[in-house]
Amino acid sequence: MLQAIGWPWPGPPADAAWQAMCAVYSQCRPARVIEQHRSGYVVAEAPEVPIKVESLPAWQRRGFPPHERAVVGDWVLLDGRRIVALLPRRTVIKRLAAGKHYRQQLIAANLDTAFIVCGLDGDFNPRRIERYCVLIASGGVEPVVVLTKVDLCVDVGAAVAVLREHFSQALAVVAVDARKAEPVVALYPWLLPGRTVALLGSSGAGKSTLTNTLLGEQRMKVGEVRQRDSRGRHTTTHRALLPLPSGACLIDTPGMRELKFTGEEDLVEEFADIELLATQCRFRDCAHQVEPGCAVRAAIGCGTLDPQRLHHYFKLRGEIVGAADRSMLRRY
């Protein structure tokens, strides 16, 4: 029954860290966090069998690191209706929480794939998609772009071509009408039994509509979208893990307005071309500005690298380094 809610193995855990923790708590049973509220957690040991449980006392203390508490998608060990341990995460998506203070916010854990849902209206923004990709890939999760509202776009192929030009060919891009049955077929390769997928994107991008289509029922509330900026209200108010008919698990999330880096990200996946060129520079500490023998500048000179792409690489790298510096200062 655990496999139906995303247990990653056909039997007992194959991961050494999981084995060790399960051995310590041998009288406890595993469960998955399917909802997280201020008042506590809802977990499941099987599909459609939610259980309200008490969290660890330490998690309720003021000042306890938020990223060390359980989040939707996490696996925990239960003693009765009480969480006694958090199993190690295989993957996680996190960002810097909104506000002036440095605080990490975990979005979801133990994912295989994250669908970046983007409407082909005023919501379409390749640079924002790029930020999502950095956050997702840095957490060990596979990003997939899902373009919705194809009926509002005159040339869907052109939008897909923009992303193909901007991103690595390895990034999957799928365009669908979220109201129809086609997403079930188009997205099936990522929705196989035992896999876990999260929906990320702005409010009004079509996440709730897509969720209802994949579920095969109208379970999630769908809101109206403002015409002036293609933004919607938060119809999804909390994260929830939902078993799909395909055998996969889907985590629906509220829309995110800010995508701040924590300082732990890297750009190896999303800027693999620049990272590879950098290894060919004459100097190991080349800043790709005016240094002789710079392979990155040479690529711009011969037209194989878009200078705007390098500019954005510098911008994102600067944000990541800045976030890392602020995190370090906060520790001392």
Curated annotation (Swiss-Prot):
Record bears the keyword Zinc: yes
Gene Ontology molecular functions: GTP binding; GTPase activity; metal ion binding; rRNA binding
Entry GO terms, CC: cytoplasm
Binding site residues for GTP: T148, K149, V150, D151, G201, S202, S203, G204, A205, G206, K207, S208, T209
Record-linked InterPro entries: G_CP_dom, P-loop_NTPase, Ribosome_biogen_GTPase_RsgA, RsgA_GTPase_dom
Any one GO biological process: ribosomal small subunit biogenesis
Cofactor binding, note field: Binds 1 zinc ion per subunit.
Keyword vocabulary terms for this entry: Cytoplasm, GTP-binding, Hydrolase, Metal-binding, Nucleotide-binding, Ribosome biogenesis, RNA-binding, rRNA-binding, Zinc
Localization (cell): Cytoplasm
Annotated binding of Zn(2+), by residue: C281, C286, H288, C294
Top-level EC class as recorded in UniProt: hydrolase
Any Pfam family matching the protein: RsgA_GTPase
Domain CP-type G per the UniProt entry, residue ranges: 103-259
Major place of residence: cytoplasm
Superkingdom classification of source: Bacteria
SUPFAM superfamilies for the chain: P-loop containing nucleoside triphosphate hydrolases
Function text: One of several proteins that assist in the late maturation steps of the functional core of the 30S ribosomal subunit. Helps release RbfA from mature subunits. May play a role in the assembly of ribosomal proteins into the subunit. Circularly permuted GTPase that catalyzes slow GTP hydrolysis, GTPase activity is stimulated by the 30S ribosomal subunit.
Family listed: Belongs to the TRAFAC class YlqF/YawG GTPase family. RsgA subfamily.
Oligomer and partners: Monomer. Associates with 30S ribosomal subunit, binds 16S rRNA.
Record protein name field: Small ribosomal subunit biogenesis GTPase RsgA
Natural source organism: Xylella fastidiosa (strain M12)
